[in-house]
Design a protein with these regions (language model features):
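Acidic, divalent-metal-coordinating active-site segment for phosphoryl/phosphodiester hydrolysis
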Residues: 32-39
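CoA-thioester-processing core
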Residues: 1-30, 43, 58-62
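Short aromatic/basic micro-patch
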Residues: 19, 34, 49
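Terminal peptide-recognition signature
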Residues: 16, 40, 77, 114
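Structural motif
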Residues: 43-44, 117
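C-terminal long alpha-helix characteristic of the crotonase
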Residues: 3, 37, 46-93, 105, ...
Length: 126
């Protein structure tokens, strides 16, 4: 991104730090330098690193193993894992909603009522 004067997109600014840590993700985004297979493996971005002449054979072996597994089980596992990603998106939306609500007239009235030990009156807050 940085090499094109762009900012991260597609939630990568949230997902990459969650996967590899904030400092490593910032370095990756800020410097815009490519990483090799060993680094990707060390950072947890890859499951394995193989020599270039073994890439196709390894991919074929993995595809054969996956094809032999129960398709509905694989499908449900993938769906559950995507739901975990949806949780991150939900947390982001919650944070935005919480932040905007903190300065709302309703919240101001609720805080004032709490400090004055009275029930809040929201009739003029909306």
């Amino acid at each position: 991104f940085i090499n094109l004067a762009l900012a991260p997109e597609a939630a990568s600014s949230m997902l990459l730090p969650a996967a590899i840590g904030h400092r490593r993700a910032f370095e990756f985004f800020a410097l815009g330098e490519p990483i090799d297979g060993r680094t990707a493996l060390a950072w947890g971005l890859a499951n394995r690193a193989v020599p270039a002449d073994q890439v196709e054979a390894t991919a074929g072996e993995l595809a054969t193993k996956l094809a032999a597994r129960a398709p509905n089980s694989i499908r449900k596992t993938k769906r559950l894992m995507r739901d975990a990603e949806a949780l991150w998106a939900l947390m982001q939306r919650e944070g935005e909603a919480f932040g905007s609500q903190m300065s709302s007239p309703e919240a101001m009235e609720a805080f004032m009522a709490f400090s004055q030990k009275r029930a809040p009156d929201f009739s003029n807050a909306g």
